[in-house]
Amino acid sequence: MKRILLLLVAIVFITLNISAVDADSVVVKKRSSMAYNGYQGGMMFNVGYVQSREFQFQDNNGLPLGQSHRLSGASMGLGGALRVGFGKYFRVGIEGYVSTLKYQPQGSSAKIGWGGLLLDSHWHIKKFTIFTGGVIGGGSYTHITMIDKGESFSENDYVVENQYVSYRHYPFLAVVPFVGMEYSLTQRISVVAKIDYMLNVTNWADDYAAGPRFFVGFMFGR
């Protein structure tokens, strides 16, 4: 996934350089409806409420460990996006984020990292810009649970390593619809806020925690 993101970043920057050269050296009387129309990039903080289905654990011998579990709570993280405008309403780019849910027992966490190709449409209303779109790309889910040594045994399907720690890590294809709004502070700086919901298309296990996330941050562009 890192190689794909690096390739996308390279493609976007090459596009920016070519477009900048064309804009500076070529005079056109009428712009194309899909002509290069600037770019923006920045960082955003995310917070959301996520929850999983019920799941259970087992030890390395296949014996059940503990009772049923369900993840739920606030997840938080950071990330960023880079978008290039084409025409009046269309933008394409890349984004990548990390979001982590921490829970008890201490040391337990469920972390999602994802990134991919971004497409959106936007509409300007004075200093405000409303946008909607989606991201398609790759995600990875890492779930670490510290097992309470005093738990009783029951039927399950999640393997516990080293007797008291469960570690699960798996990739998936992510589709992430979103809607949001920007407010222009200056010609080059905007405050941005959006809401999304990540769909795990290929590997939605019982311990996968999903829910809406709210993002807020700053975008810089020209």
Where are these regions (language model features)?
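Gram-negative (and chloroplast) outer-membrane scaffold detector with strong preference
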Residues: V84-V159, Y183-L185, F220-R222
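Residues that define the transmembrane beta-barrel architecture of outer-membrane proteins
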Residues: N37-Y39, S72-L78, S109-G115, H169-V175, ...
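Transmembrane beta-strands of outer-membrane beta-barrel proteins
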Residues: N37-F45, F90-I94, G115-L117, I130-G134, ...
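Outer-membrane beta-barrel domain signature
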Residues: K30-S32, L65-L71, P105-S108, W123, ...
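Predominantly the C-terminal beta-signal and adjacent terminal strand-loop region
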Residues: V175-R222
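Sec-dependent N-terminal signal peptides
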Residues: I4-F13
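Short glycine/proline- and aromatic-enriched beta-strand/turn motifs that initiate or cap beta-hairpins
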Residues: A20-G85, G221
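Sequence/structural signature of outer-membrane beta-barrel proteins
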Residues: G48-E54, P64, Y97-P105, G139-H143, ...
